[in-house]
Amino acid sequence: MRINKEGYKIIGISGAVCLLLWWLFYHLLVHDANVSLLWFSTLVLLLFWFFIVAFFREPRRVRIHDTDLVFAPCDGRVVVTEVVSEDEYLKEEMLQISIFMSITNVHMNWVPVGGEVEYFKYHPGRFLVAWHPKSSTENERTTTVVRMPSGQKVLFRQIAGLIARRIISYMTVGHQVEQNLSLIHISEPTRRSYI
């Protein structure tokens, strides 16, 4: 396992803040001889910092390639499976599968299919809670369409949540992508839909 490069700055800043808070607690609490409270604050700050480090973890995965399959692009829980009318690019009825990523899930996303990136668009928007039904259409999001070698097209979206403010995408139109290649890092809990 390694740490995603998008997390280096946040991990460093949060580590510095935790050290500063610990130093303040030390000087405030040791003078009062409240050692048990000092140990408790040390534990809380360490757990907070380890949580931030774990949020940016990028586990090594066995990359499987199968051109007949569409792989789940992220960790999480399937919350919606329904037929929808896709009006942005494909303009037809498609099967939508939405996956909710909680704060404890790995926030790396992988390309669900291999092929050529045919369409990519960033949509500014609101920051509704990720499980809100309108979050798929009203929240900040990116939309990507990959054309597989067979000609079939797969559309997938990264959708920001209530706390999310950043979606970092590595996609460009015309780019050839491999199935299960690292696609994006989402810096907060979110929802992911693909059609």
Which residues does each predicted region cover?
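N-terminal membrane-targeting/pre-transmembrane regions
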Residues: 1-17
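Membrane-interfacial hairpin junctions
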Residues: 27-37
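Transmembrane alpha-helices and immediately adjacent membrane-cytoplasm interface residues
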Residues: 40-64
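A structural signal for short beta-strand/turn segments enriched in small hydrophobics and glycine
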Residues: 76-78, 115, 174-183
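Short, conserved beta-turn/loop elements at beta-strand boundaries and strand-helix junctions
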Residues: 82-86, 122-126
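Short histidine-centered loop motifs in beta-beta connectors
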Residues: 110, 157-178
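Single conserved hydrophobic/aromatic residue that forms the stacking wall/gate
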Residues: 184-195
